[in-house]
Curated annotation (Swiss-Prot):
Belongs to the cyclin family. Cyclin AB subfamily. Keywords: Cell cycle, Cell division, Cyclin, Mitosis. This is G2/mitotic-specific cyclin-2. GO terms for molecular function: cyclin-dependent protein serine/threonine kinase regulator activity. One of its GO terms (biological process) is mitotic cell cycle phase transition.
Length: 441
């Protein structure tokens, strides 16, 4: 068997006939078929003019094995380079051969996540479509990120709630916290009591009765109330007695026709009833007769007292404006007695005027007196959430009644009825009647 060196020399000299070499090589290949070592589409290396080189058998040494491996790798690399070049150029308008590209299994697994590695048919659009695919993938990812989830929604709501908690509304003061240990304050059900008072205040509220009284007008009533205020102050009676006296007078006039001559008698008997109901030591009948300069006898006073109780059906437990004044003044958190005296001053001016008790309910008169007093004393804020909760009225609802009370304050110095004005001009009342009235828009 000839060596490889001899075979190469014969090819170079050209002594061997090509046909004979071909037949000989085919015969050798039939006898010496080798198992397929590579199932890839690797073309067998051919000799000159596309002729296969004859098989040379020699003992395989380490150096020869390394040379064969190096030659095989070099041939495979050259074939891959040629096939890629053919695909890139697209020779003769033919489609590129996809089988020339050796696909790595890893690339098949990552085709979905990296679409930019896919080889397009047209080489010109390969670089243009890859960024588009990348943008589409990133767009899908961004859409997935923007999709709201339950966790993100709850987180956003919690953040919004925390922002709201950082800016809370005006805090409502617990005005009964200091009276928890006071049994007379009945903190446990004081709110229920005032809810009942507000629901029942219209039942004891007098209607417009002046048209049914032929001998009495609004001015006469104002004179009577002004005189009762002076008598009340002279006897040093409680405020509850004064407000209940006025309520009894109006309710009786709303139910019975009364002559001008009996009007003062009605006031005296009403104060006697209210004193017995509210005071520990009520004034005697002789005291009332004496203060009226003996205009009426004891029998007349007692007889009128009986008539009044019959007309009112002995219904004396009524929510007067004073009942609400106590609660609303407490809700205003006054820092001195000046604010309290101003509230009482404006409330009594309102009770003296007939239009006030007809147009507005007792709770609104009390709330408007508190509002007008805070305006007069420049208390800021004039109306807060604590007052709104306990009174049940907003600032807008109280504006008309408060303006009316402030007008009465401004005109109290000009009119002849000076009983209330003199009472609250004293130093013991803080001289609140001397303060200038505010201007409400």
């Amino acid at each position: 068997m000839g060596s490889r060196h001899q075979v190469v020399q014969q090819q170079n000299r050209g002594d061997v006939v090509p046909g004979a070499i071909k037949q000989k090589s085919m015969a050798v290949e039939k006898k010496n078929r080798r198992a397929l070592g590579d199932i890839g589409n690797v073309v067998t290396v051919r000799g000159v003019e596309g002729k296969a080189l004859p098989q040379v058998s020699r003992p395989i040494t380490r150096g020869f094995c390394a040379q064969l491996i190096a030659n095989a790798e070099a041939a495979a690399a050259e074939n891959n380079k040629n096939s890629l070049a053919v695909n890139a150029k697209g020779a003769d308008g033919a489609l590129p051969i996809k089988r020339a590209v050796a696909r790595v299994p890893v690339q098949k697994k990552t085709v979905k996540s990296k679409p930019q590695e896919i080889i397009e048919i047209s080489p010109d659009t390969e670089k243009k479509k890859a960024p588009v695919l990348e943008k589409e993938i990133t767009g899908e990812k961004s859409l997935k990120k923007k999709a709201p989830t339950l966790t993100s929604t709850l987180t956003a709501r919690s953040k919004a709630a925390s922002v709201v908690r950082t800016k809370p509304k005006e805090q409502i003061v617990d005005i009964d916290a200091a009276d928890v240990n006071n049994d007379l304050a009945v903190v446990e059900y004081v709110e229920d009591m005032y809810k009942f008072y507000k629901s029942a205040e219209n039942d004891s509220r007098p209607h417009d009765y002046m048209d049914s009284q032929p001998e009495i007008n609004e001015k006469m009533r104002a004179i009577l109330i002004d005189w009762l205020v002076q008598v009340h102050y002279k006897f040093e009676l409680s405020p509850e007695t004064l407000y209940l006296t006025i309520n009894i007078v109006d309710r009786y006039l709303a139910s019975k026709t009364t002559s001008r001559r009996e009007l003062q008698l009605l006031g005296m008997s009403s104060m006697l009833i209210a004193s017995k109901y509210e005071e520990i030591w009520a004034p005697e009948v002789n005291d009332l007769v004496c203060i009226s300069d003996g205009s009426y006898s004891n029998e007349q006073v007692l007889r009128m007292e009986k008539k009044i109780l019959g007309a009112l059906e002995w219904y004396l437990t009524v929510p007067t404006p004073y009942v609400f004044l106590v609660r609303f003044i407490k809700a205003s958190l006054p820092d001195s007695d000046v604010e309290k005296n101003m509230v009482y001053f404006l409330a009594e001016l309102g009770m003296m005027n007939y239009a006030t008790i007809i147009m507005y309910c007792p709770s609104m008169i009390a709330a408007a007196a508190v509002y007008a007093a805070r305006c007069t004393l420049n208390k800021m804020p004039i109306w807060n959430e604590t007052l709104r909760m306990h009174t049940g009225f907003s600032e807008v609802q109280l504006m008309d009644c408060a303006k009316l009370l402030i007008d009465f304050h401004g005109g109290s110095t000009d009119q002849k009825l000076q009983g209330i004005y003199r009472k609250y001009s004293r130093l013991e009342k803080g001289a609140v009647a001397l303060l200038p009235q505010p201007l409400l828009a």
